A protein has these predicted regions:
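Single conserved hydrophobic/aromatic residue that forms the stacking wall/gate
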Residues: 1-8, 12
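Non-catalytic interaction/clamp surfaces of large macromolecular machines
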Residues: 10, 14-52
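Phosphate-handling DNA/RNA-contact segment within nucleic-acid enzymes
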Residues: 10-20, 39, 62-194, 198, ...
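Short alpha-helical scaffolding segments that buttress acidic/His motifs in well-ordered protein cores
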Residues: 21-25, 41, 55, 161, ...
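Short, well-structured beta-strand/strand-turn elements
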Residues: 44-57, 171-181
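Short linear loop/turn motifs
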Residues: 51-64, 84-87, 95, 316-325
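Substrate-binding/catalytic subdomain of NAD(P)-dependent oxidoreductase enzymes
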Residues: 56, 68, 303-307
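A charged alpha-helical hairpin associated with nucleic-acid processing machineries
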Residues: 106-108, 148-154, 182-198, 202-414
């Protein structure tokens, strides 16, 4: 097993360990020992096709078999410690046991980590692989390896594995989920590579609402148009689809709410509009949100929409926005015209972008020409970290060829 990787290629070795583990869990689910796991998945109404498509598996109650399997294949404890599959406190123990296993794959369909779910009420409900050189939670999304090929006009962000799987089974194969962590700028940049439009469908409880509110500015900063799907009265997409079906969920997608309007509507819950003081405070907070729009046209469009939907006097709101913007040095008022303009124009970023592109090009050249440099860099930088789509695609080929031990510059360029 190890000899198939080039000497010193730790990334290749870790990749093979994960592949062996995924195959082991997959077979356990379909064995007599995996009956409890398979019964659980069937109870969750997952079809055989869906279970197979996502490579779902099972970690049995008896531990030690996976460790023995890997040791028999020649992997030593030093590399197994870094795999995230075992704990070494008071002896060697498998991290996952008596759990349904969700293999986590990168965009190239390589297993980089695992998620495990208990079948009862034990805590923690979900257990994820620790971060390793292969597995960076902030730069990977569950289901993206399939969703990126969906050809849908958007991506749907969910909270958990089961939401993604349930949505894919119902035909919404553009669904993805962050990996036990809040949405990060890295996630947003990753989504931007494949779409300009994102729909948020987090749980409808208070925690889900807070998570959506945290995600919205991150997605906006990445240049993504964002809407929020209303799941009420159900908790999550899995529950909604089971109760109402795919057609009803599509209607919720079609009627998804603009993220800014969602923010304002959520904000309104903290105010009593029957009280003049509370109403004024609400309108001040709305004005403060509107001031954040840098472009006058966009700001004016949202101002009109907010005033129309929430029945706020437009003239009063326009004056408040102008005053707040002027105080913060964001907006200036043209004398007598009553119009708002940004005080500072954005400077073009062309020089900075050219510099980044040149740096990525140089890095790729070094990676292709020097194996030692690749081994050092590959532990920290992945193909999806390249900002330029062209270079990201080239990097994917480079990493793939180094993994197989057959580097061919001609094939990479082709």
């Amino acid at each position: 097993e190890i000899s198939a990787c080039l000497v010193g290629s730790e990334m290749c070795i870790r990749d093979r360990i994960n592949k062996i583990a995924a195959t082991y869990y997959y077979r356990q689910l379909r064995s007599e020992n995996g009956k409890a796991g398979l019964d659980y998945l069937k109870k969750r109404e997952l079809s055989d096709s869906t279970i197979n498509s996502f490579g779902l598996g099972y970690a049995t109650q008896s531990t030690g078999n996976l460790y023995k399997l890997l040791k028999d294949k020649g992997y030593d404890d030093d590399i197994l410690k870094e795999s995230g599959l075992f704990t070494y406190e008071r002896g060697i123990h498998e991290k996952f046991w008596n759990r349904v296993i969700f293999p986590i794959m990168d965009i190239n369909n390589k297993v980089i980590g695992f998620g495990g779910r208990v079948m009862g009420d034990a805590k923690p409900k979900y257990l994820n692989s620790p971060e390793t050189r292969l597995f960076d939670k902030s730069r990977n999304l569950y289901g993206l390896n399939i969703a990126r090929m969906s050809r849908k006009p958007n991506m749907i962000i969910c909270e958990g594995y089961m939401d993604v799987i349930s949505m894919h089974q119902a035909g919404f194969n553009q669904a993805v989920a962050s990996l036990g962590t809040a949405l990060t700028p890295g996630h947003a940049r990753l989504l931007k590579r494949y779409t300009d439009n994102v729909l948020i469908t987090y749980d409808s409880d208070e925690a889900g609402v807070k998570a959506a509110l945290r995600a919205i500015p991150i997605l906006k900063e990445a240049g993504l148009s964002t809407k929020v799907i209303n799941m009420r009265p159900y908790k999550d997409p899995d529950e909604f689809i089971k109760a109402m079906g795919a057609e009803a969920f599509q209607e919720r997608i079609d009627n998804a709410e603009n993220s800014f309007m969602y923010e304002i509507g959520t904000m309104l819950r903290n105010y009593d509009r029957g009280d003049p003081e509370s109403e004024t405070a609400f309108e001040r907070e709305v004005a403060a949100k509107l001031v954040t729009f840098k472009e006058k046209l966009e700001r004016d469009n949202y101002l009109k929409a907010v005033c129309r939907q929430f029945m706020i006097p437009e003239d009063g709101m326009r004056q408040m926005v102008s005053r707040l913007g002027n105080q913060e040095g964001i907006i200036s008022r043209n004398a007598g015209a009553g119009t708002m303009q940004p005080t500072v124009e954005r400077k073009p970023k062309k020089k900075r972008e050219d510099g980044l592109r040149q740096a990525e090009k140089m890095l790729l050249t070094w990676l292709i020409s020097d194996r030692d440099i690749f081994d050092k860099v590959a532990a920290y930088i992945k193909p999806e970290d390249f900002i330029d789509p062209l270079f990201s695609g080239v990097a994917e080929k480079v990493y793939e060829q180094y993994g197989t031990g057959n580097i061919s510059p001609a094939a990479i360029i082709a």
